[in-house]
Amino acid sequence: MKFSSLKSIFARIFVSLAGLTVLAIPGLAKPNRTPQTAIQPGQPWLDTNGVHINAHGFSVLDFGGRTYWYGAHKMEGKTEDEKNEAGISCYVSDDLMNWQDQGLVLSVFAPDAHPDLASAFILDRPKVIYNEATNKFLLYFKLYPPKEKGGKSGKDYAWVGVATSNSPTGPFDYKGYFLGNHSEFGTGDFAIFTDTDGAVYHIAVRKPDKALVYGRLSKQGLKPVGEYKVLDGVTIGTEAPAFFRRGNKVYLLGSGTSGWKPNPARLFVADRFTGPYQELPNPCRGINPHNNLGPDKTFGGQCTYVYPIAGRQDAWIAMFDINKPEDPINAGYIWLPVDFESDQPVIRWRDQWDLSVFSKQ
């Protein structure tokens, strides 16, 4: 067996004493629950092994006819004030409802983990894209240095970590980090957006003034090239950015800044990705019956991604985390379809739903 194959196996199989988590070879466990036939926002979401999905601050990727869900893997018994991420986890699905655990695709506890990863205070909000120029999968994530090096708050500095893989299920090889906005402070919450001309952009909250800025990434996708610019028309303090395109319009869904507490969703529209943007009304409608929170609290969630569904017409899913800072491993998820009324996005609460709400192309 080649060393590279052994390395791949050991990267997937390890015991994390810090998280009291045992990861097994993906695919060996047999499903032990009834397949899910609907998406139930705000309800516990179990994988095909009957275990709560552990992939927070997440994004999704379509590739090869399957969908991949990437998120931060939270550790049992840890709060958001502690180092609580074991790495980036991946789940795969053929129907967006039933998800098979693929294990950690990037681990901070792997024997050969880079010191940047092993010592990181925070490693979250992963985004994965496929780079056609290199035939590699690129994983971007928010990477904070050790808390004692993070300034007064422990979070004053934030990097953008980058890793690559030949497969969507990893393992991913850490390639280093870059400083968003070319600033010593770096940037916070971010999105990765591919424009119609193929250009890929890193969009992030600039530290310390919280303006939303964008910079173009290199062809290989490992670092930004050129200067960052402010997205004109986007309110200062807009975080958790998620972009999607409908026709000739680009929409930005985000939130305000209120720590772990939910706040009203923010929505903007522009004729092109680089702006200028115009603010639209809060798109949320209805009440989440599980916590009695409505539009003024985004159903208790915070936006993390807007997913365009392949093979469906005008089909997007607005995706949210339900933050639970005292017990993040058990934090939840909200997925809701995006409707359009008078060309404005509307995100209406539904207790459960399936893909039949969208028209096939």
Regions found by a protein language model. Name each.
Residues 1-11:
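N-terminal secretory signal peptides that target proteins for export/translocation
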Residues 9, 27-30:
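Intrinsically disordered, low-complexity regions enriched in serine, threonine, proline
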Residues 12-24:
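Bacterial N-terminal signal peptides
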Residues 30-361:
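Carbohydrate-active catalytic/glycan-binding domains of CAZyme proteins
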